[in-house]
Amino acid sequence: MHRISLLLRKISTLLLFAYFSAGALTLGVAVYAIARLFIRDIRGRALFIRRCTSKGFRSINAAARLLRVYRVSLEGAVPSASEVRNTVIIANHPTLIDYMILTSLLPENTTCVVSGRLMSGFMRHIISHMLYISNDLPLEDWSSLISPEDAILIFPEGTRSSHHGWRIKFRRGASNLALRLGRDIIPLRIVC
């Protein structure tokens, strides 16, 4: 019975990965091309792409729940666009899908600080159209990329967390960022 369960789990995971890949291809080609052609305002285009990405990730989360690969449960309410306005949202990073889950839940006025390594290759086009910020950029250059309406999502641990405790060792960059930009901090904790 255990072998059958394991096989079903692997098949479900494979189906979810195929669904994710098809969605990424659709977003990466069709949605971004349409947005670039028809939405001239750069910020409006970024918000449209973020909204489409969020909806795509919501559908992946729903498929994952249906296939019993994973499920997302929340404690408390998802903050609204006005509640996250002009804040720095910090979160731990225990899995590869943290960004996907948070993006599906947070409002479209949330921009993300991404690793400079993601700014090379095909991902740089998607990231730049979403007006996400490379952590390689000096803070002085961020002001042209963010609006006071935006929340900034950052994973202060850097790469994925390797511990399961409540105490999380964040780097000081997120608090320094919030202080220098004069923004409040909203902490989020992801538990697997």
Identify what each model region corresponds to.
Residues 1-87:
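Membrane-anchoring hydrophobic helices of lipid-metabolizing enzymes
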Residues 66-192:
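Soluble catalytic domains of membrane acyltransferases
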